[in-house]
Amino acid sequence: MITSAHIDDIRTQVRAWRAQGETVAFVPTMGNLHQGHITLVKEAAKKCDHVVVSIFVNPMQFGQNEDLDAYPRTLEADSQALTVAGAELLFTPTPAIIYPKGLAQQTYVEVPGISDVLCGASRPGHFRGVATIVCKLFNIVLPDVAFFGNKDYQQLLVIRTMVEDLSLPIEIIGVDTIREASGLAMSSRNGYLTEEEKAAAPALKKAIDAMAQGIKQGVSIEQVTEEAKASLIAAGFTPDYLEVRHATTLANAEPQDQALVILAAAYLGKARLIDNLRFDR
């Protein structure tokens, strides 16, 4: 696997592949990789001739009092795992390479509406940071296809909307959430959990599953939501949000909506965990 922090190196290699008529898949990450990331890379390798991965802890998507400095950097282990998974090109830029003028002077991309609710309301500016870095990475790598995890459901919709609105010639593929044996969605932030918290963490998925089951049985959204919040609090969580939305627009769910998604974010100790479930009523 070739590794470089330099934009020109990435573009040169991708151009060489394209000159041979070969296809390129891209998996953007912030490193500290787990099996969910590796699954994205393996799916990308099935789809295209070559796989490019980026590792960049993006300061633009971290808010004040968030864990930018504490976010784990595990480049050596990540590189080994990516090589085994089938990645051929790894882009590891510094903030100075990505944002040479600094964040205050950086042109940014903002997807209105869908970026402002749920995680966007809890973390102002987060999705502006996500959209900006992903758009910039797309312009550097110029992939045919890009892969993202369905665990970050709102992020995936933001990126799909950006690609559509800006007419970017890139196919976006979402890959099912990879889970621990306990049912906990794999996340780099799971490393913040104590053993006691890890034992409690599966309550998040259980609460979401119970909400979906109740809605399918005709119980009101308000009732299932209150019951789920109570179960999370009893398990030691501090809920951030727990909501039922239209599956493609993230508008508040209406009685006539069939395609729904439950989205949840909750704190367990120092970790902010998110999860979701898309289902038909």
UniProtKB/Swiss-Prot annotation:
Q: Name one Pfam family in it.
A: Pantoate_ligase
CDD domains, alphabetized: PanC
Q: Which gene encodes it?
A: panC
Record-given protein name: Pantothenate synthetase
Q: Which UniProt keywords apply?
A: ATP-binding, Cytoplasm, Ligase, Nucleotide-binding, Pantothenate biosynthesis
Q: What InterPro entries does this protein's entry cite?
A: Cyt_trans-like, Pantoate_ligase, Pantoate_ligase_C, Rossmann-like_a/b/a_fold
Q: From what organism does this protein derive?
A: Shewanella sp. (strain MR-7)
GO annotation, cellular component aspect: cytosol
Q: Where does beta-alanine bind?
A: Q61
Q: What does this protein do?
A: Catalyzes the condensation of pantoate with beta-alanine in an ATP-dependent reaction via a pantoyl-adenylate intermediate.
For this protein, the record's Gene3D superfamilies field holds:
HUPs, Pantoate-beta-alanine ligase, C-terminal domain
